[in-house]
């Protein structure tokens, strides 16, 4: 029996992501098909000056990632911000962070499934009108693949990530050689180009929020930390490594597109594709087109791994019924996979994910802000704990990350605070449904 059990554990460990695999998983979780539309969306507000805002947002994401990297070093299991909040501030806070986090990831997955169908039909017009069947078919396929075990999902995730990075990396490399030419042609002049009737502050705020959408997903790796080998060491390194790579790629893609098209960015529906064609000829168009499809397919595969494990982590911590965390012989959280799939299916049928996604940004920050605060608290609670990465300058960076995050929420829409309050009331109500008046603080560090 012991030998069989040992072999089973060895097989489970082998199925997990290595450090390089974890880094690729992190890149895949952030880069979706939206990267191919990003230059046009942000150029409309500020012109070439959007590059400066991109740099600023990348700094914010690095601050949040640094906090995430430190807190991840305390844990070796799934849950991400929920785990950190629970350990630092107790079950009530952990439940709120976890339930809102799970909800927003299900909503995001439904949106990504719909996005996959849309891009699939753009690539293969013969399937026009079959959006819903394509989305549901993808959902069922990924759920079955996930039930088959992490090894299968991992193989497809890494394959899709490498495939989608080919056109992105190629474009970025070519962009390096064309940026100076774009400067000479005047495509970066004037540097600041405000839309008529808008203020500088509102343009910066809206552009910053849109750019931030492009980075959403960097927290995903911490949510599935239990699926990584040696997570306390590898997850912090992979978080910082993946977000650094993504930041460089984003900057080069935006700069390269502006260099090639300048103001013509606003006159095309496919800015990166058109810019790539000008760089390397007609072959650039299909490279970007198929790259976008593979990109969002890879994103969906990654979400199918993460979303149910978020719910299962809540069950593992006894914040939701333990049956939700039940695993099959392949160590896949089969009940959480089915329930997550049902919720995503219902959202696809209703179409409500679109309206929900518009204010879900505030619930994303419910993952980021508690993580930054937990970095300060856990450091005080466990001063002797050696972590792979420790945020420098004491509490300065976590506090700065929290302040800038709040400014981002307000800059997007002040109604975000109302939506956030409503979400907290609902989540708190659910906590009392499941736990009655058992408000207690969990101070034990998980092992």
Predicted regions and their residues:
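Hydrophobic transmembrane alpha-helices that form the core helical bundles
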Residues: 41, 53, 62-139, 143-147, ...
């Amino acid at each position: 029996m012991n030998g069989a059990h040992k072999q089973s554990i060895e097989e489970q460990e082998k199925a997990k992501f290595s450090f390089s695999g974890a880094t690729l998983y992190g890149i895949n979780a952030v880069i979706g098909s939206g990267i191919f539309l990003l230059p046009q969306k942000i150029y409309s507000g500020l012109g070439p000056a959007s590059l400066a805002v991109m740099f600023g947002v990348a700094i914010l994401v690095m601050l949040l990632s640094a906090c995430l990297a430190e807190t991840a070093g305390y844990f070796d299991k799934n849950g991400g911000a929920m785990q950190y909040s629970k350990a630092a501030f107790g079950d009530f806070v952990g439940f709120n962070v976890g339930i809102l986090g799970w909800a927003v990831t299900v909503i995001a997955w439904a949106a990504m499934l719909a996005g996959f169908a849309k891009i699939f039909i753009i690539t293969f017009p013969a399937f026009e009108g079959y959006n819903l069947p394509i989305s549901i078919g993808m959902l069922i396929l990924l759920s079955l693949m996930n039930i088959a075990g992490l090894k299968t999902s991992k193989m497809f995730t890494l394959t899709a990530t490498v495939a989608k990075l080919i056109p992105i990396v190629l474009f970025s490399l070519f962009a390096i050689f064309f940026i100076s030419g774009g400067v000479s042609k005047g495509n970066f002049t004037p540097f600041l180009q405000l839309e008529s009737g808008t203020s500088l502050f509102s343009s910066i705020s809206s552009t910053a929020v849109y750019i931030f959408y492009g980075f959403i997903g960097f927290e995903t790796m911490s949510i599935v930390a239990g699926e990584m080998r040696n997570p306390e060491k590898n997850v912090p390194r992979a978080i910082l490594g993946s977000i650094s790579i993504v930041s460089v790629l984003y900057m080069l893609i935006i700069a390269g597109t502006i260099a090639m098209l300048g103001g013509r960015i606003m006159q095309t529906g496919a800015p990166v594709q058109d810019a790539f064609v000008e760089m390397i000829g007609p072959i650039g168009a299909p490279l970007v087109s198929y790259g976008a499809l593979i990109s969002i397919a890879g994103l969906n595969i990654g979400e199918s791994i993460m979303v149910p494990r978020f719910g299962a982590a809540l069950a593992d911590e006894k914040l939701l019924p333990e049956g939700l965390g039940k695993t099959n012989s392949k160590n896949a959280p089969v009940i959480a996979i089915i329930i997550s799939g049902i919720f995503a299916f219902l959202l696809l049928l209703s179409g409500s994910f679109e309206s929900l996604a518009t204010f879900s940004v505030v619930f994303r920050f419910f993952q980021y802000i508690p993580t930054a605060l937990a970095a300060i608290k856990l450091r005080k609670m466990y001063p002797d704990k050696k972590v792979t990465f420790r945020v420098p300058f004491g509490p300065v960076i976590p506090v700065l990350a929290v302040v800038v995050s709040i400014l981002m929420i307000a800059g997007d829409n002040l109604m975000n605070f109302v939506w956030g309050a409503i979400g907290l009331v609902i989540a708190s109500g659910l906590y009392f449904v499941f736990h009655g008046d058992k408000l207690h603080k969990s101070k034990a560090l998980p092992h």
